[in-house]
Amino acid sequence: MGLMMTFIPTQKELFNKNIEALSNLFLKESLKEIKSSKFELILGKDNLDINLKDTSDNTFLYENVIDELNSMLNTYNDKYLLYPVLYFYGFGNGILFKALLQNKNHQHIVVFEKDIEIIWIMFHILDFSHELQSARLMVLQTSSLDIEFFSNFCSSKPFFQFSRIYFLELMSHYYERFHEDVLELNKKLVQDFKDSILSHGNDPLDALQGIEQFVYNLPQMITHPSYKELLSKRKGISDTAIIVSTGPSLTKQLPLLKKYASKATIFCADSSYPILAKHNIKPDYVLSLERIPLTSEFFNNDFGEFDKDILFVLKSYVHPHTTKYLQKNNRNFMLVSTYASFINYLKLDDFGYFNMGFSVANMNFLLAIHLKHKNIVLIGQDLAYAKDGLSHTKDYSNLDKHEGHFQRDKNKYTTQAYGDNGKVESSFVWTLFRHNFEQDVQKIQKYLDTKVYNCTEGGARIEGTIEKPFLWACENLLHKDLN
C-alpha cells in the first residue's frame, strides 16, 4: 500500500522540470504514472541530510546520510578522480551525483535503478535538470533494458572506449536487497563489453591474414556474380529458409529435412555441406567465412551432378584454397564483403556489404534476412555439447580436432538448455555465437515481420527464438514445392 505524498506547487514544478530534461522516454512515462509511494521522506537539519524510509519494512535508504556521502566522495576523489564514466546501482538521494559531476573529468555517471519510486520522490526535491539534459547523468530502469540496449550501449562512445575500467558501485546497503538484479545486470554489462571488444578483432595477425587473402581473392570476386545481383534476382522468392548447422542434434533431423527439402530454401554451413551431400539433400546455398585452410577442406571433393544449382557464397577473405577447390569442378560461387574500412576504400560496393557475425550460422541467418525470408528455421544449432560430450554431429569430418574440449570446458560455460530442459555445457566460442544470435534475433523481431524458429530440439536455448519441433515447422510452414 503506497503512501499519498503531498508535494507543494514548487516541488511539482521541479518534478516536471526534471522530467522534461530526461531523455529516456520509457522512464519518463513510468515516473509520470506514479501517484503514491511506500517511501517516507526524512529531512535532517543539514540541507544534504535527505533520507527515505521504506515503510514496507521500516528500513532506511541510508544509515547515516552525511557520513556515507562524505565517505563516498572521499573514495571517488581519491581513487577515481580521472574516470570518464562511473556506474552506480541505485539512485539514492542523488546528491552524490551532483557533487561528483562538479568534476569535469567525469563525462557520464550511469545510474541503474530497480525501484523508480525513489527517483520519483527525489525529482520533487532536487534539481537534476542540468545534469540530465547534458546526459552527464544517465538514469536507467533495470527492468526496461533489453538485449538491444546492452549491445548498443556497450559498443558506443565513450562507454566502449573505457570498458576496461568498468565497475558497478552500490549506492548504499539498502540496495543489497536487489542482489540478484545487481548480479544479473553486472553479468550482462561485462559480457556485452567483452563481445564488443571481440567484434573489433583481437589479433593483428588475423587481420593481416584477412587483408592478404582479400587481395588474393579480388580477381575471383570481380569475375563472379555480385551480391547486388544476388539480391536483385533472389530476394523474396520463398517464404521459409532452413539453416543447417553441424551440432550433435543434426543427425536426427536429416530424414525429415530430406523429405521436405523441395519445399524450403536450404542454407547450410560449409561443415554441413559434405554431410548433406552424403545423404543426397541438396542445399540452395552453402556459406563459408573462415580464413583458415582447414575450412577449405570441406570443398576438397567432387560431388558431380549434386553440385548443380548450388550457390556457394563466400566471405571475401576466405582462404584461397576454398576458391581453388570450387573452381576445380566448376561450382557456382561468389565472394561477398562485410563492412571493413580497408574494403570500403576500394569502392567495390556491388560486392557487399552485409554484417556476417562471428560464425557461418550467423552469416547464413543474416543472408536469409536480406533475401527477405519470412520464416527462418534453425536445425543443428546446438551451440552446446551433447550429453555424451560430442561437439558436432557424428558425420562431421573434424570431430577428432575437438577431442578433450568437453572436459576442458565442463562447468565453465553452462547455460540454459533448449526447451528449458535443465542446463547444458557450452564453450567460450559457442557462447559468443549465441549472444550474437540473440542480439540479431531481438533486433529482427523488433523491426521486421520475420519469425525465427529454433527447431534444433537439443543444445542451448537461444533467447528470443520460437522453440518448435522440426516436424511442426515442416507441417505448418512448408506447403508446396518450390520451382
Regions found by a protein language model. Give the residues of each.
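Extended, hydrophobic alpha-helical segments in both membrane/secreted and soluble proteins
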Residues: I266-S272, V286, F312, A361-N364, ...
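Short beta-strand segments
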Residues: Y89-G90, S245, V313-K315, I379-G380
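Short, acidic/turn-prone active-site loops that include or flank metal/cofactor-
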Residues: E113-I118, D270-Y273, S288-T295, S316-V318, ...
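Glycine-rich phosphate/pyrophosphate-binding loops
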Residues: E113, Y273, I281-E290, A368-H392
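Active-site-proximal structural scaffolding
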Residues: A269, E305, K315, G357, ...
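Active-site phosphate/oxyanion-binding loops
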Residues: D388-N421
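Active-site/ligand-binding-proximal alpha/beta "capping" segment
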Residues: P320-K374, I379, L383
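N-terminal donor/sugar-recognition subdomains of glycan-related enzymes
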Residues: G2-A241, P248-T265, P274-K278, Y285, ...
